[in-house]
Amino acid sequence: METFLLKRWQIRNIIKNETVRNTDRFNVHFARMGEPTWNDNVLAFGIVLKEVVKSCGLIAKTVHPVVSTMLPRANRKLENFIQTWCGIKNDFYGGEAGLQFSINSTDDEQRRELFDNKSHSLATISEMASRLPMPKGRKYTLNFPVTAQTILDAKELSRLFDKEKFIVKITPIHETASAVENGFEVTGYSDYNVYRQFEQPLLEEGWDVIVFVPSKEEDADRITCGNALISEGRFNNY
């Protein structure tokens, strides 16, 4: 219950401190600062999110929640969570919600290194994916944050996943302190040509592909994935 109330407070705090009161789209991503599939409150909050947004005074034509998961193999309730979220996405939101799998590589050995051996194998993920219902609205997403070292085999991806269910999203490794310290290649990442080598083979295989090219301004403003902005002042009235 405390987590549920915290999520409600977070959304309310964001909206109340913005001057925008009308928007075409309000996105909420359950991701990155904690694996959402460990938290059943995410499912419950997905149901009440529209009402929370409305009660805060924001008029949004579309409220679009997204669950992004690295598919932890220690979570015995993982598939049940994902199937329940698919029901929320497809039925409650009429397709206007998202489910994203952080795949990151089509090579299991590289994935074990990237996820510290805490994610399911590609074979297991493929089996779970085959049992997902056909998506309404936007397809489910296979996410690949890419660097020069990323292994992304388009033919292997086609063997593992259904193109009718999934799209591929190619994103950057943002230029955070952690990324630099761990030796990820982030130079030139705001140049579209960096991603073309990954995109073209996927297109040739018949995949729908989204390429997200960031801007330096996003990292400078610390609004991207992997960044946390901590106030230097003291918190009051909390």
Which stretches of residues belong to each language-model region?
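Alpha-helix N-cap and loop-to-helix initiation/capping positions
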Residues: T3-L6, N41-A44, F115-H120, V186-N193
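Auxiliary Fe-S-binding modules of radical SAM enzymes
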Residues: S121, E127-Y238
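Conserved radical SAM core fold
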Residues: M33-W38, V67-R76, N90-K118, K136-L142, ...
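Short, well-ordered coil/turn segments that N-cap beta-strands
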Residues: N22-F26, A60-H64, Y93-A97, M134-Y140, ...
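Short helix-capping and hinge/turn segments at secondary-structure transitions, especially at repeat
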Residues: K54, S105, S130-M134
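Conserved Radical SAM active-site core
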Residues: M1-G94
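Alpha-helical scaffolding segments of alpha/beta enzyme cores, especially the outer helices
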Residues: N13, A44-E51, N80-G87, T124-M128, ...
